[in-house]
Regions:
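Short, positively charged and aromatic/hydrophobic N-terminal segments
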Residues: 32-33, 38-41
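Methionine residue identity
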Residues: 1-2, 17
């Protein structure tokens, strides 16, 4: 019965959108909606951060992460002790080596020169990827990016306060730097902030750039699910609850098993619930399980919305 009702809902959703909007604007802030534009799927990856804090725990977590991860991130700044060669050898998956500064949400307390030395050592050790921030002093960043290397460099920007209006300009500046992959992560103060990152992903595909674009915070959780489906290079998921490396990060198990972000899809539609709160709703479990059971490529996500009118103003171009 549930699957039949779900199918009927999907087929008739475009006719319901105008009625949904009127109902929501009257104050009913907890209704299902569908972002019903068809999207073409892009193959992406789930990255599981390994946070230690000890060498032995890191090795255990590498093994535990293997079934969930397409790629691992070794967060050296969060490890009290580590043997990088041993960690890289233990992983059957490609690894990103990150040594995050405190100003960008990490814990590395040494000098910038010391931090760069560790990243260079990671490249020599055979890390497939290394992450370096745009905030790195220019006299260190420029030669690092221009150096001969086998490792691919992820050039990253993090903003833990908001999603700045000049995000497009930032992207353009980063495109002018010799990095292999760009990473832009901002804080979502409103659900519509996610659209700025989705637009960057769309632009990066036209530009032929590999881009990781995500929003942090509760209102940014949808980006962690949808960005990889829209063409983002990868998304981050914690190994388990309590091992998040950024606000709003959800578990790798949820990304892979509930939202199926790595499943192959020819095209898909995005359904969801909007309201505040939305995370007490079990709709994402019920609907995504039902989609899987009926062989649908569609997805259902929670949209944490404070202002319904602004939400429809921002997202309406994506409705059919």
């Amino acid at each position: 019965m549930m699957l039949s009702r779900l199918t009927e809902h999907a087929e008739g959703i475009s006719k319901l959108m105008s009625g949904l909007k009127k109902s929501l604007l009257k104050g009913n802030n907890f209704l299902r909606l569908a972002w019903v534009r068809n999207f073409v799927y892009n193959v992406s990856m789930i990255c599981i951060p390994i946070v230690g804090p000890t060498q032995s725990k890191s090795l255990q977590d590498i093994v535990a992460a293997e079934p969930l991860a397409d790629i691992l991130e070794l967060r050296l700044d969060l490890m009290s002790d580590y043997d990088l060669d041993a960690l890289l050898a233990a992983s059957k998956k490609p690894c990103i080596v990150t040594n995050r500064t405190k100003r960008e949400g990490g814990q590395f307390s040494g000098s910038e020169e010391e931090r760069i030395v560790l990243l260079k050592q990671a490249m020599v050790a055979g890390a497939e990827y290394v992450d370096i921030e745009t905030s790195t002093p220019k006299e260190l960043l420029k030669p690092f990016l221009e150096s001969e290397r086998k490792s691919k460099v992820i050039l990253s920007y993090h903003n833990f306060t908001d999603t700045p209006e000049e995000i497009e300009h930032l992207y353009e500046l980063m495109c002018g730097m010799p990095a292999d992959i760009l990473k832009i992560v901002t804080y979502a103060r409103d659900i519509n902030n996610n659209l700025a990152l989705f637009n960057l992903i769309h632009r990066s595909k036209k530009d032929g750039k590999k881009l990781i674009a995500l929003c942090m915070g509760e209102k940014g959780e949808i980006s962690r699910i949808l960005s990889p489906l829209l063409g983002g290079f990868l998304t981050f998921g914690s190994l388990e609850t309590g091992k998040e490396t950024a606000p709003g990060q959800i578990t790798g198990a949820s990304l892979r098993d509930i939202y199926r972000v790595c499943d192959k899809r020819d095209a898909f539609k995005i359904f969801g619930v909007i309201g505040n709160p939305v995370y007490k709703s079990m709709g994402y479990l019920i609907h995504n399980r039902a989609f899987k059971e009926i062989g649908s490529t569609d997805i259902y996500v929670p949209f944490l919305v404070d202002n319904v009118e602004n939400f429809f103003k921002g997202f309406s171009p994506y409705f059919e």
